[in-house]
Amino acid sequence: MNDTQVDHSLCMAHGCNMIASMSLSTKGDDWCCFIHVKAERDDWQAITAELNRLGWLVEAVKCIRANAPEKKMVEVRRNIGLAQRSDLLRKESESAQQWYVRLENVLAESCARAILKEGQL
């Protein structure tokens, strides 16, 4: 991919690396991630900044969703450890889907806090 190509599998919000999963239009274009699609456009920059700050977690979510090979999942677990967030490791009792949803919820909550924080500035 060169500088003029756009990865249409990613969210349309500038700089967002999350997977695009929902469309803002009935025409099927303007695809966004699950966080940007629900947000006011005025909040998109704060959301994208927070998702970029948590890039290791965004990558984990993308790997789980893609059912990445074990080699990649080892890297995901290592990055979670490096971020000192062992609470986000997969629990023995949860399926990959449950883990995925839990990590997405962490991202959504963190973005909501970032929006509130920006509104207080």
Where are these regions (language model features)?
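Intrinsically disordered, low-complexity regulatory regions of eukaryotic proteins
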Residues: M1-L121
